[in-house]
Amino acid sequence: MPKLITAAERLILAREFIQKARDYPLPIDGGKYDFSYIAQVKDLLRQARDMVKYLPHSAGAGTIIKSDALRILQEADLADKEILH
């Protein structure tokens, strides 16, 4: 049975995924338009979103957790625009 991840751990992991996407090295050939690079960055940002996407709707999460989750979702969207556009 998989280990349950608490809401606080999910927030931390989501931030780490966003940071990994920002730090992902640009390939020499093709730069930021390389399909492999785009796929890896989008996958990391998707993992970050998946970590927190249900927290704002969770009854057991406090208001601070919910607001942090919404902030992370916005940060993932912003990182997508900054990195790939």
Give the role of each language-model region.
Residues 1-85:
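Long, charged/polar, soluble alpha-helical segments
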